[in-house]
Amino acid sequence: AAPSKATVGESGIITPGGRLIQLPHGVSIILEGPSAALLSNGDFVTYESS
């Protein structure tokens, strides 16, 4: 079974559904919630629903 929340590291995110999102160089996560993350470059990453 897939984890119920995202796994976040310095260089990327593994979403609850198993999708790997590589962060661009110099970009970090400034806010993380149960269904999405806001990045320091203004991008918004939405996780797929499980």
From Swiss-Prot:
Pfam families: Cuticle_1. Keywords: Cuticle, Repeat. One of its GO terms (molecular function) is structural constituent of cuticle. Calcified shell. It comes from the Eukaryota. Sequence repeats lie at residues 6-23, 30-47. InterPro entries: Cuticle_1. This is Cuticle protein CP498. It comes from Cancer pagurus (Rock crab).
